Amino acid sequence: MKNKILLLSIVLLFTGSVFAQKADMSLIPYRIGDVWGYASADRSIVIKPQFEDAELFYEGLAVVKKAGKYGYINTAGKIIIPLKYAKVTHFRFGYFPDSKNTKPADGDLHDEKKVLFAGASLTVDGYEICIGAKGQRMPKCPAIPENSATDLNIPEKVVVKTNYSTIQKSDLFDKITDDYKMVPGAEQTYYIATRANNYGVINNKFEVVLPFEYSMIKKKNLGGMTYLLAEKNGMHGVFFGNGSPYISVENTKLQPVSAKNGANYFIVAKDGKTGVKDMTHKYVVESIYSDITYDQTSNGFILTGADSTKGFWFITGKTVEPKYAELTVLPGGEFIKVKTQAGKWGYINSQALDFFEE
């Protein structure tokens, strides 16, 4: 196996989100009162609630807490690694390089030994070590495969800029800043231009299709068609690429969102209320919230109530109304983790079903 590796420091073990890895969502932590167990997707209890805390399963093992100490159980609920640690991380795979097969020139490895490991410490401020799947201490920490550090593997974006300096200034405009076609392959070309510090749009016949009265105009491709995001006097709206109105310029906030399910939405705010519209102008999230943000790690929108409480709208169409003190979205969009006003955490699935009981 030929893999480049990224060396792991002990410090990185406890950052949690540095390296992406999928959890096993077939068993979900389930809380009854103050104790945690595990339930299947239909909320049937599989592992009896008995722990002070319980995390998701990774590679067949899950972190649990009892009597103030952390350890690990398997999917049958059996304690595999004793509950004796002050802090731990979930298990993941790493590699021990074979030093005989290391290229001196660039450090590439021909052969590696794949190992399952986690970070652990016997005291909160103590020395952090790596342990194996049976709880044994490793002499050193494994390396992390470079392809698991997703933020390091995003290809650089190539931005092609058009030089408009050859287009002479005229009485119609001062400068062209961008161009576009309504749809790929269309004959008509449109130009975003400025005049007297205001933005407008002209076509290739030098006809004004959007007057020069906006403080900002930007193009946005949604569903294969070009739209124009416009701002005037602090208000935001959207036009079709040909200048026809789409969403009136009367919103204090307007944010286009291309969701992971392929659908496109607009977060719109007016008169202090925020909602979400689909491409047919229908409100899929009613305009009653103080703020809404799209969560990039999932398929949904975080809702903020007037009292700063948090809720969530799943792409499935289900709404969890704002009433929680905190909210964390789990990658994949199937679950959120919420903190109640009483300070207790719990999981909710994309059908808005609670995996906890008070």
What are these regions (language model features)?
Residues 4-14:
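Sec-dependent N-terminal signal peptides
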Residues 16-20:
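Sec/Tat signal peptide C-region and signal peptidase I cleavage site
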Residues 21-358:
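Residue-level detector of conserved, function-critical positions
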